[in-house]
């Protein structure tokens, strides 16, 4: 019954392997980034995030987070360079967060957890569509951005203001004209490694690009994330208090760092 996965005691990350055996695979995400063990690689380039023409469409509560969806029918918002070969189109972004401000990020840095983590999901245009790309080892590229508790984030507030209208699973709301680059800091220094989606189906098709510099979020803004529901309307209320997967074994992988 694969559609019953979640983040609870009986269906959470430690149970996923039963329906999705790849959960114990060789390139699972997230991981802890040990800054003393990362490898500088002169072949890495600066990231090119070309989001000027980005066309956000709508916001959807999918029962495990909420997605802000983009028009990916053309090269409107793309990611290039960095560790990547080719062009990757932005299809959606979403967040992972915790039940308190001291946890919630999926990646950790020297075991340190942040309050939340933004994932900007892109697919390799050489594969024609997201579904096909998600099955390929170089099919997806996800940019991870840590949210660190501090000042309120005005760009993020535009997103949070819509959450009341998508409180329960299956609800969606129009969300045009949002610029995803407003959520990013200017400095795009990063760590990168080969990994996976961090929730089922956990496909091992992701080149991870984790930005070193966190963006800010206030404690008050964090409360808004936790006001969403995992459940659909009319079902018993289950607050979306936490939706993060813990760090997975690095196994035979290297985390590379830019700049060196």
UniProtKB/Swiss-Prot annotation:
Point out the annotated site residues (description: Fine-tunes the proton-transfer properties of H-64). 7, 62, 67
Which coarse location class applies to the principal site listed for this UniProt protein?
A: cytoplasm
Q: Does the keyword Phosphoprotein apply?
A: yes
Per UniProt, Zn(2+) binds at 94, 96, 119
- Check the record and name the InterPro entries matching this protein: CA_dom (IPR001148), CA_dom_sf (IPR036398), Carbonic_anhydrase_a-class (IPR023561), Carbonic_anhydrase_a-class_CS (IPR018338)
Q: What else is known?
A: One minor and three major forms were isolated chromatographically.
Which family does this protein fall into? Belongs to the alpha-carbonic anhydrase family.
Assembly and partners are described as: Interacts with SLC4A4 and SLC26A6. Interaction with SLC4A7 regulates SLC4A7 transporter activity.
What role is this protein assigned? Catalyzes the reversible hydration of carbon dioxide. Can also hydrate cyanamide to urea. Involved in the regulation of fluid secretion into the anterior chamber of the eye. Essential for bone resorption and osteoclast differentiation. Contributes to intracellular pH regulation in the duodenal upper villous epithelium during proton-coupled peptide absorption. Stimulates the chloride-bicarbonate exchange activity of SLC26A6.
Q: What's the name of the protein?
A: Carbonic anhydrase 2
Please spell out the taxonomic lineage of the organism that makes this protein.
Eukaryota, Metazoa, Chordata, Craniata, Vertebrata
The record's gene field reads CA2
């Amino acid at each position: 019954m694969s559609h019953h996965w979640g983040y609870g005691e009986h269906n959470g990350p430690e149970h996923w392997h039963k329906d999705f055996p790849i959960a114990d695979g060789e390139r699972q995400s997230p991981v802890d980034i040990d800054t003393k063990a990362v490898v500088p690689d002169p072949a890495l380039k600066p990231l090119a995030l070309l989001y000027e023409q980005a066309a956000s469409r709508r916001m959807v509560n999918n029962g495990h987070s909420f997605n802000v969806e983009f028009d990916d029918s053309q090269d409107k918002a793309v990611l290039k360079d960095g560790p990547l070969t080719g062009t990757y189109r932005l299809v959606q972004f979403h967040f992972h967060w915790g039940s308190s401000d001291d946890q919630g990020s999926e990646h950790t840095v020297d075991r340190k957890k942040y309050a939340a983590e933004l994932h900007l999901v892109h697919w390799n245009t050489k594969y024609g569509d997201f579904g096909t790309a998600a099955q390929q080892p170089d099919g997806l590229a996800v940019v991870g951005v840590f949210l660190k508790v501090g000042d309120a984030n005005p760009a993020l507030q535009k997103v949070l203001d819509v959450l009341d209208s998508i409180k329960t699973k299956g609800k969606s709301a129009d969300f045009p004209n949002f610029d995803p680059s407003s959520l990013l800091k200017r400095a795009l220094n990063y760590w990168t490694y080969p990994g996976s989606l961090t929730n089922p189906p956990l496909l091992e098709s992701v080149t991870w690009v984790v930005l070193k510099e966190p963006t800010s979020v206030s404690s008050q803004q964090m409360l808004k994330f936790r006001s969403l529901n995992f459940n659909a309307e009319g079902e018993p209320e289950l607050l979306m208090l936490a939706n993060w997967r813990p760090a997975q074994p690095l196994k035979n992988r290297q985390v590379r760092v830019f700049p060196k």
